[in-house]
Amino acid sequence: MALTVLVAALATFLYSRSHVLNSFVANAPGRLAKMNTFENYEVKFADRLRNCEDAVLLTERQLAITACDPGRDKWNVVMGVYVPGHLPHAELFAYNYATSGPGAGNLTPFQIIGFPNATDFHTLGLEFDEATSTLFVTNHAQAGPRIEIFRLDLDALTATHAATLTHPLITIPNSIQLLGSHELYVSNDHYFTTREAPLLSKIETYLALPLASVVHLALDPTDYTVQSARVVARQAFANGVALLNDSTLAVASSSAGAVQLYTVDADRSLTRSRQITLPFLPDNVEIKDGRTLLITGHPHLPSLAKFAQSRHVCNDPEVLAAASDEERAMCASTPGLSWVAEWSEEHGLRSIFVESIYGSSATTLWDGKAGFGLIAGLYEKGLFTWRV
């Protein structure tokens, strides 16, 4: 009897993981079936930007805001990369993607004001509140996990630090979805962190254990201190979060190869309603034209892990010059892979970009009025842009 139960449980587990296990074979670099539906595309600022995981579009201004962290090559809490030595920090940038007018095409770093820990700034998710011109940024600082809050002057392109948000439930924050100027959901991508329990974190990832969390936070409107905090959902590898509509929250489940859809209850609790199964591992989710999910992620987990572990060698000329022949060959032969798809209730899932010309895709954004799209890469140089 016990053996029967064990076999049944194992069969159920393997079935639930079959599409992810299949991706290890079907999406390997030599087998990945590539596609690119974008005709007029360009990688911009490859000589100035690297490792820009997330971005937001301010469509009325035709302005993209992104955070780029070259230090991710040596410090990645999610993937367990910890290389000793000097660690560069992240910066905030504004890209004016207009095709005409003052400043069109310019990339400008924000001047950071009043941020005492600016050298310990290692960014992941971004969320912007237009009503108060406030930017929320998840920060995997060496000093501990936190959310940084900045007031932006979009004319002067300054970012004045307003607060650092910490809380016992903010353990490994990844993505943010605002519900108002002082209310938000935050995803914690793991329960076990690679800093404190590397083996357990790896087991949690590869078995897709539903231990990661989505936390609801209510903040004080004057100083952003936490008034209330509670876990409202648990799932495997909670990554990007986005409101599909007023009553539905989408949460990427990276290690499960899926996006979970939740009903948002009146008290901000979440009730799981359905799962979107994917042929790749999703990173971030965004909304296109108010009704379609843009899902961005990684085709092949083993390749992504290898790519992440090699960046501190491949992107540092001095280290690369002193590297072994094997390491240099790895840098030349290890591609970054990307997968972008869109999903809607009406049309289902449709892949729109499966490529290695721009790798490690993490976020895709679309401004339909301007006919402008952008992909940001977790471990890539520059921003992939296209126009229609």
What do the PLM-derived regions correspond to, one by one?
Residues 11-20, 279-351:
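Loop/turn-rich, solvent-exposed surfaces of beta-rich toroidal or solenoidal domains
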Residues 66-87, 138-140, 187-209, 298-334:
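Short, conserved, GDST-rich strand-edge loop motifs in beta-rich repeat architectures
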Residues 301, 361-388:
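Blade-level signature of beta-propeller repeat domains, shared across WD40, Kelch, NHL, RCC1
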Residues 49-58, 115-130, 166-183, 191, ...:
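Beta-rich, blade/repeat-based domains predominating
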Residues 58, 64-74, 135-142, 184-195, ...:
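Conserved beta-strand positions in repeat-built beta-propeller and related beta-rich domains
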